[in-house]
Amino acid sequence: MFSAFRDTASIGFSDTHQDEKTLRFLKKQISQFIKHLKEYYPNNELTKKLVMKYSDVQLLPYTKGATKDTYTSGLFDHTTGVIKIAPRDGLGNVRDEQSLNKSICHELAHGTRVKYPGESSHSDEWKDAWKTFLKIAADELGWKIEVPCSSVSFYGLTKDDCENCVWDQDPETCPKTAKLA
């Protein structure tokens, strides 16, 4: 069942209990976020698209990331509307609330658009939705959300995009990928 963790720490009974707690946390957070959108932004296109597409959240087993020494923290299945979020990092350690909240906002933003074959998942339209969701979650719901250097390097986030997020370092000091340089 947990063979995907072969390269990481071994998983025991208490770990699966922690994963179950993580799933309950994800369900609670997403429910709170969507309820907030429906109440305060009922006519907004992002709300309409997300409510139409989102169906559930599940845990994502460990998957190696697209670049060296990374893991896939989440994904949005456009066919089913299911968000899958990794409960553990690449070392097999349980992710904290700030990290999970970042993934929630990131993946919910994917649910606001239609992705066509061959098109980038991280389009400008998606980035705008993600920035909007980060601000709503941090400013209006009081969520603690991490913004690691990778979010600056890969997606071009700036302090202005989420002033109340928890930045792991000054965004100006984060390396830029060739795509953003």
Curated annotation (Swiss-Prot):
Function text: One of the minor capsid proteins that constitute a network internal to the major capsid proteins and outside the lipid membrane. The minor capsid proteins glue and stabilize the capsomers.
GO cellular component terms attached to this protein's record: viral capsid
Signal peptide location: none
UniProt induction comment: Expressed in the late phase of the viral replicative cycle.
Organism: Paramecium bursaria Chlorella virus 1 (PBCV-1)
Ranges that cross the membrane: none
Location of the protein in the cell: Virion
Subunit structure: Interacts with the major capsid protein.
Principal localisation: virion
Domain of life (superkingdom): Viruses
Keywords of this entry: Capsid protein, Late protein, Virion
Protein name: Minor capsid protein P4
